[in-house]
C-alpha cells in the first residue's frame, strides 16, 4: 500500500467511525398494524421517507387484530394501529394499553345491505350477519336500533363480509354487514339488494364509533416518553407527506400492502384527505380537537374532547350486544397527554382535500 492511499484511508476513518456510531445510536421502535389497511400504514411512509431519522421502525402486519392487541399488552410491540372499538375491552381486561389518538373515521366504507324484497319493517326473527366484536357488529346494532329493533329481535350470524356473500345470494340472510368489493358482488349477482345505511350517514358519523386509533403500551409511554412523542409526531408527519405526495404514497402503500393501487385510491382517496365510500384522514389538529387538547370543532359533529364519550358509547353498545357485562370509566382507556404535549410544543397540522 502506498503512502497516499494509506493516508486517504486514515483520513476517511473518523468519518466512517462517526457514521457507524450514528447508525448504532438509532433506537428501535416496534410498531404493529392490525390488518393490511391503508389507514394503518402511515408508519411505512415514515420509514421509507426517513421522517424519523433517529429511529429504526420495525413494522409488523398481524392480520389478526386480537393477536396484535395481545402483543401490545405483553410489551412485544410498543405502538399499535387498529380500530377504536377495542378500547372498552382494553379497560375491561386491565391491560397496560391506552388509546392515544383517533386517526381516521370510516367515511362510507362500511354498509348494511338488505336482501331483495326485504324491508326494514320485516326483520324481526330474521337472520342478519356481522362479524362479532368488530365494527360491523356495532353498525348493524346501531342501525337495527334506529329501526326500532333490540339486538334480541333478530337472529345473529357471525360472518365476515366475504363470508356473507354466499348466504346473501342463497336467500339465507335478510341483511348483512359488508364493504367493497363484496357489496358490488352481491349487487351485481342479486338485483334488488340495497344499501340502507353506511358510515358516512350523519347519525352514524357523529357517534365517533367507526374510527381507527393509535394505541400505545403504557410502559412504553412511561419509560420512553420522548420516543413516544417522537413517534406520534412522525405519524402525523407521514400523513402530511401523503397529503402533499398522494400519488407517490398511494403507489408505495399498494406495494407495501400488496393491494391493487386502484383499491388504495378507493379507500384513502387521491385528494390528500378522504375518499367517499372510504375513509377520512384526520390531520393533527382534528385529532387534537377530538382529544380536547386544541380549540376548535372536529368534523362530523363529534365534538371537542369527545374521545372518552365515544369510548363510553362503544362500551354501552358492547353491553347491549352482550359482549361485555358492565360499563367502565372510559377515561381509563384514553391518554391524550401525548397529543397535548405536541400541541404545547407548537406542533400544528391542518389541511383540506385538494381540488
Regions found by a protein language model. Give the residues of each.
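Conserved C-terminal helix/tail region of periplasmic/extracytoplasmic solute-binding proteins
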Residues: 308-355
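Functional cleft and adjacent loop/helix regions within the main domain
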Residues: 65, 243, 335
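Short, glycine-/small- and polar/acidic-enriched structural segments
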Residues: 26-180, 196-199, 207-208, 342
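Pocket-lining segment of extracytoplasmic ligand-binding domains
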Residues: 85, 157, 163-167, 173-264
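Extracytoplasmic/periplasmic substrate-binding proteins
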Residues: 114-116, 121-125, 212, 287-296
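Bacterial N-terminal signal peptides that target proteins for export
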Residues: 1-10
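Secondary-structure end/capping motifs
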Residues: 223-325
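C-terminal segment of classical bacterial N-terminal signal peptides
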Residues: 14-23
